Amino acid sequence: MAREYKIEDYRNFGIMAHIDAGKTTTTERILYYTGKSHKIGEVHDGAATMDWMEQEQERGITITSAATTTFWKGRDGKSRRFNIIDTPGHVDFTIEVERSLRVLDGAIALLDANAGVEPQTETVWRQAEKYNVPRMIFCNKMDKTGADFYRSVEMIKTRLGATAVVMQLPIGAESDFKGVVDLIEMNALIWRDESLGAQWDVVEIPDDLKEKAEEYREKLIETVVEIDEAAMEAYLEGQYPDNEQIRALVRRGTIDVKFHPMFCGTAFKNKGVQPLLDAVVDYLPSPVDIPAIKGIDVKTEAEIERHASDEEPLSMLAFKIMNDPFVGSLTFARIYSGKLEKGTSVMNTVKEKRERVGRMLQMHSNSREDIEEAFAGDIVALAGLKETTTGDTLCDPLKQVILERMEFPEPVIQIAIEPKTKGDQEKMGLALNRLAAEDPSFRVKTDEESGQTIIAGMGELHLDILVDRMRREFKVEATVGAPQVAYRETITRQHEEDYTHKKQSGGTGQFARVKIVFEPNPEGEEFKFESKIVGGAVPKEYIPGVQKGIESVLSSGPLAGFPMLGVKATLIDGAFHDVDSSVLAFEIASRACFREAAKKAGAQLLEPIMKVEVVTPEDYVGDVIGDLNSRRGQIQGQEARGVAVVINAHVPLANMFKYVDNLRSMSQGRAQYTMLFDHYAPVPSNVAQEIQAKYSGQK
């Protein structure tokens, strides 16, 4: 079977946004207008096609990034293939956003015209910057009370530090929003309400907007000619680019992430979606427009590139594992190069295991179609893979490569979980392992002392949903303990420790002496090990044992047994015995050496500090600030946003549990908040003593 669509006609993109900016509704409209969804699903009544997990339908928030393939005829009448990845907008799921951005070529950033740039918008925007993803902006909900397109444009500059190139102006706002002015064609599009947005009339620009349209077209041209010398010179000599030249320049600037074309509309009221789809074709990149993906050649360890071509060796990245009720475990993968046929054997170069592709599926949010082969640029779901987890590379066994890995944040919150009955016990273990394979930001461990199962994640909602999924999908009933904070420990001063390990009673003896300087690592939170041994005081082959010994005890600090951050260890001297010394002896010595030193090097407890943003009506500002202060919060600033006030604060996670209930009652349900992990900071001594007493079992 040959390739149906040329790779130049692919658009792999996602929709990223704050929690309520209307992402699922916008995706639904795209599926409706591209003919993939016959009934428009509304999030309000839990029927959206992309939101296919039961809980998403109940909570009205998107949790799993479902991948959907659909098609759209552009302005030129030629059909293009869209692979759309739906991403969640809730802070507890930023890991989902990050991993979908990793495999996208472009994105549409959605703003709520009333709220503008919100905290989560900033978070996903920063993640997109990290992966250099070209973005367009859609200012949604123009029909909402308080909708202000021009304020949103300003906020993109002030809050995101980005350049928005305005491509359309709104005609009317709030309940009077009728259509848009197209600043390239310089005409107006007015939607017909009765046709569910499928039809619109092209009319002249209304008189009261003509001057503004001229002003914004001038700004548009000024911005785009800056990226091309010839166009700039012509412009300065009074020659304006024609419409197709403007489009070509906007495309180039968008793909090079110099600026972001901005559109407006209301997905809910079916206005503005089709011009947005045309813009996806016109301005977002195809797989060949972006730089080739880099990787490491497994044989030579040299950096190599894989270009978006069917002729290159097969390489793909697994970016999501999902449990499908009909097919079992599905691995979503983006094919960067080469071709993949059903039944082929591929190499997982991260796990060093071969995998066989049993079935290959093309997904449409929750319906699926079996396919025989797939090509560069495709996003496919593979059934039958046993070893692969998120972030692994799959490739041609004869041309092995490891593509750039994804980084996943450490969980900040943990809870103990117990099965309700004996029958649930075994099922719970299986369920937790399956969920952990799907979600790399979710960890499962057993507490060595209490024997309890501990689950850790990115926030309360994250863990709630996983426990809920366990009940629904795996029929496991479990009781959940109170959430606990993931504290850390560190050292605050330099200390030199000399330790000798000797065991000479019967059989082979053990001997190792180490002298190590421990100090805070100035370069960050990682552990750093150095050896400054000269003259063979410790033979070279024993030095890895010293490092391994220290690393093995970093997981349990001296104060309350929490993992340690930011330690630097330098081995400066030691001694060995010709017969009794071994790697193991040095491992034991360095382990004991660090345990001794950690107590004397100013051990300190650290706690996760969250960046909290509260949006509240003015009447409740005093109460909100007072409450945040009582939670050991530090107010970073406040600003007016429309009729509301935005309060930014840094607050210890330990004091934020059940905050949502407090905020609701304090503001009669009118205030909202978002919370993100920001950094680790020392715990005040009075609080630290309580924590130590609690975790050292003295209470």
Swiss-Prot record:
Q: Which residues bind GTP?
A: 17-24, 86-90, 140-143
UniProt keyword list:
Cytoplasm, Elongation factor, GTP-binding, Nucleotide-binding, Protein biosynthesis
InterPro entries per record: EF-G-like_DII (IPR053905), EFG_II (IPR041095), EFG_III (IPR009022), EFG_III/V (IPR035647), EFG_IV (IPR047872), EFG_V (IPR035649), EFG_V-like (IPR000640), G_TR_CS (IPR031157)
Keyword Transcription assigned to the entry: answer is: no
Question: Which BP terms from GO are recorded?
Answer: ribosome disassembly
Annotated GO molecular function terms are:
GTP binding; GTPase activity; translation elongation factor activity
Please tell me where this protein is predominantly located: cytoplasm
The cross-references to SUPFAM superfamilies, in alphabetical order and at most eight, read: EF-G C-terminal domain-like, P-loop containing nucleoside triphosphate hydrolases, Ribosomal protein S5 domain 2-like, Translation proteins
Specify the signal sequence span. none
Boundaries of each tr-type G domain copy? 8-288
Cell compartments where the protein resides: Cytoplasm
What is one cellular component GO term in this UniProt entry? cytoplasm
User: Can the keyword Ligase be found in this entry's annotation?
Assistant: no
| Free-text function comment from the UniProt entry | Catalyzes the GTP-dependent ribosomal translocation step during translation elongation. During this step, the ribosome changes from the pre-translocational (PRE) to the post-translocational (POST) state as the newly formed A-site-bound peptidyl-tRNA and P-site-bound deacylated tRNA move to the P and E sites, respectively. Catalyzes the coordinated movement of the two tRNA molecules, the mRNA and conformational changes in the ribosome.
Q: Provide the family line.
A: Belongs to the TRAFAC class translation factor GTPase superfamily. Classic translation factor GTPase family. EF-G/EF-2 subfamily.
Question: Which NCBIfam families does this chain map to?
Answer: EF-G, PRK12740.1-5, small_GTP
Write down what this protein is called: Elongation factor G
- Organism of derivation: Sinorhizobium medicae (strain WSM419)
Q: What is the lineage of its organism?
A: Bacteria, Pseudomonadati, Pseudomonadota, Alphaproteobacteria, Hyphomicrobiales
